[in-house]
Amino acid sequence: VEAAGGIILVPNKLSLQFFKPVDAGGTVLHSMQYSKDVLEADVFISFPILKHHNGTGLTMGLKNMMGLVWDRGFFHRTDLHRTIAECAAFKKPDLVIMDAVRGITTHGPMGPGTIREYNQLVFCTDPVAVEAYGAELFGDKP
C-alpha cells in the first residue's frame, strides 16, 4: 500500500504528533485535534462496519469519523450525538464503503453480540445515506 503512495491509519495507536488542531466550526465541537493524514490526503475513503452501539444505537458512516479525532472522550463527556454530527460535517469522505457482509446487531461495540448475515458491501459518497441504509437493514426508521 505504501509503495503505491497510500497510507494505513490506525488512529487508536497514534500519538498526538499525527494530529492537527482545527476549527471544527460546530456549536458544541468548536475545535479538535484531527488526523493530519486525512486532512492532507488527495482522497479520503471511510470503511465502517455495520454494528450496534450501546451509546448511539448504530455505528457506521458518521460515528466512524470519531476515530480520526484525538480526544474522543470529549464526545462522550459532552453531547455524543451532536459532536458526532459536527465531526462528520467537518470533513466528509470522498467515498464510504460499509462492510455489511455481517452485522453485529446487539451489545456493540464491544460484544459479544448477535451476528447477522447481510452479505452486502455498500458504496456511497454520502455518509448520511449509508447510515440511513444501515438503519433500514437493522429494521429501524432512519
Each language-model region and where it sits:
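N-terminal and secondary-structure boundary signal
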Residues: 1-142
